[in-house]
């Protein structure tokens, strides 16, 4: 690798927003390395990090609340470009001598801001121009407070009727603040705004590319594991497949993959995994049949958080059993990625509200015998896919829909039973098969079936059927932080429903989930 891809770096300080790591995703898409650190990062650590620019992210709190987070003094002492987003703008304004007040009109969702001032941040960037020549931007708002008085040196850059200071700028110091969220895809020019800050104002070079990331990850893995052996749980999903390819390239035969058949996998998945990796790629793969153990532990358990933790603990137990058959296994590799971390805690500050735990994050026991290797931990899903292609994995594998670590265990609502898993497997297979036939599989970001533990009356032929209900779920998203339900053709939905009810005797009714994220999550549990 000819260049240090970490040489030009942006520091993102997290105040607890669920969007914080999405900012990092955008900065990396621009091609610049960045790291997220908690808002109370020490002044010494900030100086040592030597960022070319700093982004103050959003957060759920108000600057008026007791003990609400503030930016460290080093943020201002470094005299590097500064960009405050939402709460980041508010605390920046308040700490520099401005004023923040609660807004009579809270803005959540789409808004149009008028660009009423001049500054490098928004120069030449607009969605609309009205008859009077006023530039407008379509943005995403999410705030209850607003800046009412700017610090010395700032001027108004953009405004809305209910938020006169929707953006502020001080070009002399390269300090900027916006009340909207440029990191969210609903802000149409958001990536251009962030690019302007990162590339032009901060002067960063775009060194963060797939080929450089692969080289860096391989070097990091080799430095971490040395000559030790590594175990990887290989599910056949995108994340674990990319990890397998990356580790196989980095350490070769030091890698042993364990495919755990937990009884909660997709139809024919076990055979497909073995064929792809063991036969085609030459990776060492051990197939462990642990269906009885998993289903036995899950019997009688309905709480989704408890199910996740049981699956996580049992997963590690199976690895322990396999590791004892091998010598000198020190590391456990996982396909943990950024969204896993985001939804488990929002970030490291403890300020964000926990939505759900993740199999790769919150369900692992503290006495785990292995050290973790997580080469994808800092990557978003689309970055992982680009890395997979860079490593030579097939397109259809790399762009396969995400599958949760706990598998069908979190797509069966309530208690998990073998009967439910078998029915769900068949229904899910039909849904995916028809999505491909109608050329809708790659138009959706994720699609699956959910088993609902309720029965409904149906009529098949001349007979009455009292059987289970399933729900189809399909979403469209770029970043998995926000998602809308996929507007599938009625003909497709009808075909899927008819096939499921006619071909699977245990199912009598099919529904379609039309919930978006937020407020719903993509998975039901």
From Swiss-Prot:
GO terms for molecular function: ATP binding; GMP synthase activity. Catalyzes the synthesis of GMP from XMP. Keywords: ATP-binding, Glutamine amidotransferase, GMP biosynthesis, Ligase, Nucleotide-binding, Purine biosynthesis. Pfam families: GATase, GMP_synt_C, NAD_synthase. It comes from Pseudomonas aeruginosa (strain UCBPP-PA14). Residues 9-207 form the Glutamine amidotransferase type-1 domain. It catalyses: XMP + L-glutamine + ATP + H2O = GMP + L-glutamate + AMP + diphosphate + 2 H(+). ATP binds at residues 235-241. Residues 208-400 form the GMPS ATP-PPase domain. NCBIfam families: guaA_Cterm, guaA_Nterm, PRK00074.1. This is GMP synthase [glutamine-hydrolyzing]. Its EC number is 6.3.5.2. It comes from the Bacteria. The active site is at 86 (nucleophile), 181, 183. The keyword Phosphoprotein does not apply. Homodimer. InterPro entries: Class_I_gatase-like (IPR029062), GATASE (IPR017926), GMP_synth_C (IPR001674), GMP_synth_GATase (IPR004739), GMP_synthase (IPR022955), GMPS_ATP_PPase_dom (IPR025777), NAD/GMP_synthase (IPR022310), Rossmann-like_a/b/a_fold (IPR014729). Pathway: Purine metabolism; GMP biosynthesis; GMP from XMP (L-Gln route): step 1/1. One of its GO terms (cellular component) is cytosol. The gene is guaA.
